[in-house]
Regions:
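Generic protein-terminus/edge-of-domain signal
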Residues: 1-68, 72
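Short beta-strand His + acidic residue motifs that chelate non-heme Fe in jelly-roll/DSBH
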Residues: 58-60, 82-90
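A short, Lys/Arg-enriched amphipathic alpha-helix from helix-turn-helix/homeodomain DNA-binding modules
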Residues: 163, 185-225
């Protein structure tokens, strides 16, 4: 982990990938418009939403490694480490990234609200998976915000517009996150129900007389899950 890119401001990453610097506290990058880039293991001093269709494989996020699904979002916050060490190869990525400095939020109600967006946490073990409609809406918002940054000088009025767009994007992400949690809760409930039925049938059939207490291995095989 010697070659870590320290993203102390949004424009550090913009310079790294060769994208225009649009604002000192916000960066919006359309990966499709920049040359193929090198991967980097990043130490984040900013908030970020990586909204992509083809993430590099074996990404690091905290102490974990994972492969992101197609059309998904990875959210990062200051103090986190994530990405992938430079492999020496140029890769082409399709999608967008929104980076914004905590300084932009100082003194705003959004600053206090950030703790409610739990998808920024290392404990969020999955990326946010978008359907085509969500992909279209979120990327359209980023495109519109980028246009605002390109056409207007920094001012209190522009910062209010920036915060409005960012809040809307974050709320879309929150809705996706809550949907995934609901789906995961339903899946967990279904597994538990199947497990209880399995144990009930096991004892009703008298299998304990020949096989003893059902083992983790046995239950996993019957439920088609790994015992680990």
């Amino acid at each position: 982990m010697n070659n870590i890119l320290h993203i102390s401001s949004p424009n550090v990453y913009a310079r790294f990938v060769g994208a225009p610097e649009l604002h000192p506290l916000v960066s919006i990058i359309h990966y499709d418009e920049v040359s193929p880039i090198r991967t980097s293991l990043n130490n984040y001093g900013v908030y970020g939403l990586f909204i992509q269709k083809n993430f590099p494989r074996n990404l690091t996020y905290g102490m974990k490694m994972f492969d992101a699904a197609d059309a998904s979002i990875i959210a990062v916050e200051p103090g986190q480490i994530g990405g992938k060490e430079d492999s020496g190869e140029d890769i082409h990525i399709s999608g967008w990234v929104l980076l914004f400095s905590p300084e932009l939020l100082h003194g705003t109600d959004l600053e206090a609200k950030m703790k409610d967006y739990q998808y920024f946490s290392y404990f969020a073990t999955e990326t946010l998976k978008m359907n085509p409609s969500e992909w279209g809406r979120i990327t359209q918002l980023l495109s519109q915000l980028r246009h605002e940054l390109q056409e207007n000088e920094d001012s209190p009025a522009l910062r209010a517009v920036i915060l409005g767009y960012i809040r809307l994007v974050l709320e879309y992400c929150q809705r996706i996150y809550q949907r995934q949690l609901s789906q995961e809760d339903k899946t967990s409930s279904d597994i538990l129900k199947r497990y209880h039925n399995l144990l009930r049938e096991y004892y009703l059939d008298g299998k304990q007389m020949d096989l003893g207490v059902p083992t983790v291995q046995y239950c996993a095989e019957q439920l088609a899950y790994s015992p680990r």
